Design a protein with these regions (language model features):
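Ordered, amphipathic secondary-structure segments that act as subunit-interaction surfaces
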Residues: 20, 62-73
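HotDog/MaoC-like acyl-thioester-processing domains
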Residues: 34, 66, 70, 101-151
Length: 151
């Protein structure tokens, strides 16, 4: 993906509001991705003005899935027309939550591919991810994901 500034993440993830937990991709390649997400009062995982632990894990999973998901699209496909994907967390190998962000804060998620197995139309992968605000780490985790092309 060469022009990530024009990338509409909704075209590459199967999630839709109110369950979309990524606003934009900051950088992406075959082994790393960085995303951002602004916490809003109407987010499904906000309770009493705080984005919950479950929301942080879901944000990490959506961020992680974009590394493997991008391989199902052509390099110049910034419209997300090349494939439709589904995916889910198959295991949470480890998770540590240090703090939860408040409404109005923007979180940054950085994920790295640890391992990957590809079959004809699906991938099973392990990824590590950290989620932070500008001044502190909120979450670190290792997730297993299953990603499948459905068309």
């Amino acid at each position: 993906m060469r022009n990530i500034q024009s990338l509409d993440i909704k075209k590459f993830l199967p999630h839709r509001a109110p369950f979309l937990m990524v606003d934009s991709v900051i950088s992406i390649d075959d082994e790393h991705v960085a995303t951002s997400f602004k916490i809003r009062q109407d987010d499904i995982f906000v309770v009493d003005g705080v984005f919950s632990e479950v929301g942080l894990v879901e944000n990490a999973a959506q961020t992680c899935s974009s590394i493997v998901g991008k391989s199902y699209f052509d390099e110049d496909d910034v419209e997300g027309e090349g494939a439709k994907l589904i995916g889910f967390i198959s295991a949470i190998k480890s998770v540590k939550v240090s703090a939860c962000p408040k409404v109005g804060e923007t979180i940054r998620s950085d994920a790295n591919l640890v391992s990957r197995f590809d079959a004809d139309d699906y991938s099973i992968c392990t990824l590590s991810c950290t989620v932070s605000t500008s001044d502190k780490e909120l979450l670190s985790c290792v997730l297993n994901l299953f990603i499948q092309k459905i068309n």
